[in-house]
A protein has these predicted regions:
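Short hydrophobic beta-strand element within catalytic cores of glycosyltransferases
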Residues: 342-346
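Acidic donor-binding loop of glycosyltransferase active sites
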Residues: 117-120, 311-328
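Nucleotide-activated donor-binding/catalytic signature segment of Leloir-type glycosyltransferases, i.e.
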Residues: 281-307
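Conserved donor-binding/catalytic core segment of Leloir-type glycosyltransferases
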Residues: 6-12, 181, 225-248, 254-258, ...
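A charged, aromatic-enriched C-terminal amphipathic alpha-helix characteristic of glycosyltransferases
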Residues: 373-377, 394-431
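N-terminal subdomain of nucleotide-sugar transferases
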Residues: 1-68, 116, 262
């Protein structure tokens, strides 16, 4: 290891925002990519003390509703090795993915000075990989780029309208990067299938790496408790969103709870966490109708801190994560597993892949896909699996499944398990450059 610390520039893809008095504000503590970045950075700094420092690109704290100082996102022990690059990005998961102010960086010499000692970049904004590459080239800086790929938009699994899709930019990032990093193997496979639609050859691709990152186990472990809610609690932690044919399938959860209410006599509480705090009256009416008024939706104005969330999931019994077209399955399912929830999920993609790797293809709470709507789980089967999970509460089976989810979640989705793989990728890119300079 060289004497000076390796400096990592980490550009975070921020997409979670809400409205306050009609004006948009970022929700960093509930943002998936922000929490992934916090977890990766914290884990690396803890495991490799005095070897790394980070320059983290985020919007300003005053442009959020849940952060007073960006430093507060990290534990005090890490503050000395973290600095921030403030970026005034549009409040939108779409327009922010295309925003890049090249002139800003070129006109102010302070930016060049900031980047001169950067050794490597981790880029969550994979639609902007080529932009960063061009900027570094203009500055005559040899900064290798690891582009992460957490949210694929492609003809296989479209997320936004075709004319503004991220697809071509994301495919370009596989070429413009030095390493293309994927959250899970299922995501890598889907990305390569999408790439083959656009390009004839894979020879120009950057090397690929599967990190296996989903959640920060140390953070979740702090809130572990054996004391569960008195009433068995089932929750849906993903967005209430109509994007991409309701790709989070919040409506399926509501429908399943409505069915559940007719087939069980056991008490239960069903909650939708509404993390973006943007549920519309129309969405709430749909949820009420489908669920037969059996689902509580956290209100847009209800305060729910990161600590509140971690306390809630650790005291809950059953988590439903119902992604079909988003292959990783969402950060919330990883957090649910590590919190020892019984996880109800479709038998597809990363949900299935990690269970297969762990030797549990027969996981009892996998759900079927709707035969008429292949992008959605079957609501009746979801209801049946929730009922079976409810029936298991207080039995040996509940304990066994909770421990199984916990152990598989840690092994296949924790930053702690992924840390050495990530650091190895950084070393692979940085050491040859440092050796050449020396």
């Amino acid at each position: 290891m060289k004497d000076k610390k390796i400096k990592v520039f980490y550009a975070v893809q921020v997409s979670n925002f809400t409205f306050v008095d009609g004006k948009p504000k970022w929700l960093l503590r509930n943002d998936a990519c922000t929490n992934i970045a916090i977890g990766i950075i914290s884990t690396i700094l803890k495991r490799y003390p005095d070897q790394f420092k980070f320059l983290v690109k985020l919007p300003a704290a005053f442009d959020t509703i849940d952060v007073l100082h960006l430093e507060d996102l990290f534990k005090p022990e890490f503050h000395k090795d973290i600095e921030f690059l403030i970026d005034d990005i549009p409040h939108s998961p779409v327009t922010s993915r295309y925003h890049f102010d090249m002139q800003r960086y070129l006109n102010d010499p302070q930016y060049l000075k900031t980047f001169e000692d950067v050794d490597v970049m981790i880029n969550d904004e994979n639609t902007l990989t080529k932009n960063w590459r061009v900027l570094f080239n203009e500055w005559k800086l040899s900064i290798p780029i690891i582009s992460t790929n957490y949210f694929l938009d492609s003809p296989i699994a479209n997320k936004v309208p075709e004319r503004i899709r991220y697809y071509e930019r994301q495919m370009e990032s596989f070429i413009a990067s030095d390493i293309a990093a994927f959250q899970c193997e299922a995501g890598r496979v889907e990305a390569m299938e999408a790439y083959d639609i656009l390009f004839k050859s894979r020879d120009i691709l950057a090397p690929q790496s599967v990190w296996g990152v989903g959640a920060h186990y140390a953070e979740i472990e702090e809130y572990h408790t054996d004391k569960k809610f008195e009433i068995p609690t089932i929750y849906f932690g993903n967005r209430i969103s109509d994007t991409a044919n309701r790709y989070t399938n919040y409506d399926t959860f509501a429908e399943a709870i409505g069915i559940l209410s007719t087939i069980t006599d056991k008490p239960f509480r069903a909650v939708m966490l509404n993390p973006t705090r943007k549920a519309t009256p129309e969405q709430l009416e749909l949820i009420n109708t489908l669920s037969k008024h059996q689902v509580e939706v956290m209100s847009n104005s209800e305060k729910f801190t990161r600590a509140d969330y971690l306390t809630f999931i650790n005291k809950s019994h059953i988590a439903c994560n119902l992604f079909v077209t988003e292959v990783h399955g969402g950060v919330t399912h990883c957090e649910a597993m590590m919190a020892k929830n019984i996880l109800v999920m479709p038998r597809v993609n990363n949900y299935l892949h990690k269970m297969l790797k762990a030797g549990h293809a027969d996981y009892p709470y996998f759900t079927k896909i709707d035969q008429d709507q292949p992008h959605k789980p079957d609501a009746r089967d979801v209801a049946m699996k929730i009922k079976e999970a409810l029936d298991s509460i207080g039995t040996l089976k509940e304990t066994e499944i909770r421990e199984l989810c916990h152990d598989i979640g840690y092994k296949h989705e924790s930053y702690e398990s992924a840390c050495d793989r990530i650091v190895n990728d950084i070393h692979t890119l940085v050491f040859p450059i440092l050796n050449h300079k020396n």
